[in-house]
């Protein structure tokens, strides 16, 4: 399986939701080379919870946030990997193979990008 970096922008994810996200993340059969959380100065426990799973946490001011620029800032700090997966803090994995299924689509040489729908 190819290597990948997982980037997740966050803002006040909430303790219960964030714990649910990390619980589903830990069950994934394919784990990233690197998990990067980019947080827009959350005022709840978002960063504390995230820090138990990764030390790759970037904090920006809320005024710095924009969808593309925020993701690019996180990407600039990423280690080299075969792929990058961008998710949101509220995209809970539907099953333990979700990341593996996303990456498997790149076995088709005609596929350059993949996006999913939220359920």
Where are these regions (language model features)?
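Short, well-formed alpha-helical segments that are part of the catalytic scaffolds
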Residues: 13-27
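Conserved donor NDP-sugar-binding/catalytic core segment of glycosyltransferases
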Residues: 92, 96-119
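Hydrophobic targeting segments
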Residues: 3-8, 22-25, 34-38
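A conserved acidic beta->alpha catalytic loop
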Residues: 39-47, 91-92
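Glycine-rich, basic loop-to-helix element that forms the pyrophosphate-binding segment
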Residues: 62-79
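Acidic donor-diphosphate engagement hotspot in glycosyltransferases and nucleotidyltransferases
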Residues: 46, 71, 95-99
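Short beta-strand-to-loop acidic/aromatic patch adjacent to the donor-nucleotide binding site
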Residues: 81-92
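Short, acidic/glycine-rich phosphate-metal binding loop used to engage nucleotide
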Residues: 12, 59-67, 92
């Amino acid at each position: 399986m190819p290597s990948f970096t997982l980037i997740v922008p966050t803002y006040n994810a909430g303790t219960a939701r964030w714990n649910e996200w990390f619980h589903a993340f830990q069950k994934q059969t394919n784990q990233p080379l690197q998990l990067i959380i980019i947080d827009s100065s959350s005022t709840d426990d978002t960063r504390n919870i995230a820090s138990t799973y990764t030390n790759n946490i970037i904090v920006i001011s809320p005024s710095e946030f924009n969808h593309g620029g925020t993701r690019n800032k996180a990407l600039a700090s990423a280690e080299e990997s075969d792929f990058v997966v961008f998710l949101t803090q509220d995209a809970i994995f539907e099953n333990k193979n979700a990341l593996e299924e996303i990456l498997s689509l790149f076995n088709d040489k005609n596929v350059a990008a993949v996006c999913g729908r939220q359920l």
